[in-house]
Amino acid sequence: IGFRVCVHDDFAASASSIQLQNTKPHPHGMLSLWLDSANDFYRAPIDQAIAAVTARFHGYLVSESEPMPNTQYPPTKTGDRTYGMNQIVMLQIPDRMDHEQWLDIWRNSHTFVGIGTQSTFAYRQNRVIRAVTYAAPQYDAFIEENFPEESMFSDKHYYDDQADKAEKWDPLIDRYYPEAKTIRAKNPDAPRWQTNALIMQESVKRFIDIG
């Protein structure tokens, strides 16, 4: 069994003013497990162990893709807290879109925007195959994005303005989201981080309905 634990700890709570919470009650953590089988019989002992230490939990079988592994700040040993924060985004396909259209925009276009316009140092995409627990809320995907600590308190740090990252990711953004070039052209004097924020916000609108 492989695992990764993400909890809403005291450090994450210090940035509660900037958190967007569309899910109630707000989850206090996420446990990622890599199992030989997610079938009920083989998963039962794990579900029992989780139930023993939580008030409530929901489980999902997902297909994980990791376009940007954490090579910059990997934990030095099992049990160490990973540097910074892990932002979790729960996605639902808007009624205005079909599944294939939504998946194509998210994975084959927005991926480059999400990584290239932000100070992300790790990026994971989890497409939900099915819920594995009773009455689990309906989600279509989960995104996990790791950010440096400074990003929790500064838009400038959040929307990464490092030139070395731009050199790699800007060409990919322009190729798979051409509208980014138009946004830059309309804001020639804006600081890079502000332009990145505009590109990110416009790209998100394509496949996410912001409440």
Question: What is each model feature region?
Answer:
Residues I1-G211:
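Macromolecular interaction modules
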